[in-house]
Amino acid sequence: MGLRNVGLLTLLFFLFYACSDDDTSGDTNPDLDSDVIRSINVRLNPTGYAPLNALIDLETLEAVSVEITVVGREGSTSNITRSFPGTATSFELEVFGLYANYNNTLELTLFDGSGVVLENREVTVETPPLIADMPQISIDVPTNTSELEFNLVNYFGFSQNFRPQRPFIFDQFGDIRWYLNFTSHPELSDLFFDNGMTQLRNGNFLFGNAATRSIYEIDLFGRIVDSWSLQGNGFHHHVIEKPDGNLLVTINDASKSTVEDVVIEIDRATGEFINTWDLNNSLDNSRRGWPTDLADLNEDWFHANALEYSAEDDEIIVSGRTQGVVKLNQQNEVSYILAPHRDWNTSGDGTDLAQFLLTPLDANDQPITDLDVLDGTVNHPDFEWSWYQHSPILMPNGNLMIFDNGDNRNYINAGPYSRAVEYEIDEQNKTIKQVWSYGKERGSETYARIVSKVSYLSDKNSVLFTPGSSVSGGVPAGKVIEVDYGTKSVLFEATINPPNTIFNISFHNVLRVSLLD
């Protein structure tokens, strides 16, 4: 029979494709004593970029199907098992999820076409230690789930050299099960991905690289699957995939004296820019309602740090760290502005921006008319604005959740605290109601002046709250906190301590990586 590439896209730990550039490690044609297996060969880190991945070449004497278990060292919950339908005699199996500095055990079970077990076989794979750039991970609140869960960390820590940035995935036991090291990569050796990687629907990863001014799709072995040039413009901060496959990207427009204030849509198939949102036109680039010591506002007046796409009305939501959150239609016209009401005047195209400001409602759905609350000088018992925010996300109910960093809160650095906050927005009536929040009760412990993210985990009705630049006891640390949406009880909490950081940033964000269907 011909070669069968066994696709493991439904589990993070196994994917399509093989590579011949590798280091052999583990059992290589051992004394098999088998009536089924002709040969087994294990190649560790076949691309050179994913040290905890391996490739298994398996040849059999008759047609079989295969089940593989990566045996976890924290009991059965930490196992990764996958069964493969269909039969063949020649396989290339890619394995993801090995432990570093460990003699890993892989259990292979071979079945005939009727599902009868023909043979069980153990294969061992010895791995090197983690590189020195990886952090210490402590589990502060262990999860009680019986499912193996994975957290993708868009990491800013390092030992000696910040670049290339090195994303990693750790499980709920605090073990790093995957990471990328592009130090020897011909194109990504100076990787700066800012917001970092997101997982595409096909299981691959999407990110931008400021060093090459390009967007990339890679697989879990670090192989470039596709790329898109930004045509001389700079990348900063975020790229997301639309439902139709096209890409939305925040860029530095090379033709402008300002930065981080333009969004483009890239046709995924052709690489063409098919739409541009220039915030200099839709907003007021002279507004200085939110001052900062982290940027020159004459150049970096908006600081676009995150995007969200609203499929319901084909509009985009853009977070500007020093302005607020704005929703724009395809013609670059403002639908609403989520920000305190201070100093909103006329846009670059001459439009009065005050008409797009949202009026907060109290718990009884009555408008809050206190001018100090509208201005942001004080908070209302039922409502607070978000400040210098990141990570706007649309929830299944249509509400907007934001990571409210809380920098310069109430213009006096009140707090300090950061929040995950959910707002219900009525675009027609231009009202906003705060319906849920978490983080204020944690105070300075989870305060992150910059970066950070929130995610809503619909399968568990929980929120992942990840302050990435918090400081604990004077030592930079990031927190990964999962809270129950209904009770706000902490379901899981981990602390990430890198050896070194830039601007006290441990990570830009953390994503709960899903198993694919």
How should each PLM-predicted stretch be described?
Residues R38-L55, T60-V66, V70, E92, ...:
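Histidine-/acidic-rich catalytic cores in large beta-rich domains
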Residues L9, Y17-D22, F91, G174:
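N-terminal processing/targeting junctions
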Residues G86-E94:
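Aromatic sugar-binding surface patches on proteins
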Residues F13-L44:
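Bacterial Sec-dependent N-terminal signal peptides
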Residues M1-Y17:
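Sec-dependent bacterial lipoprotein signal peptides
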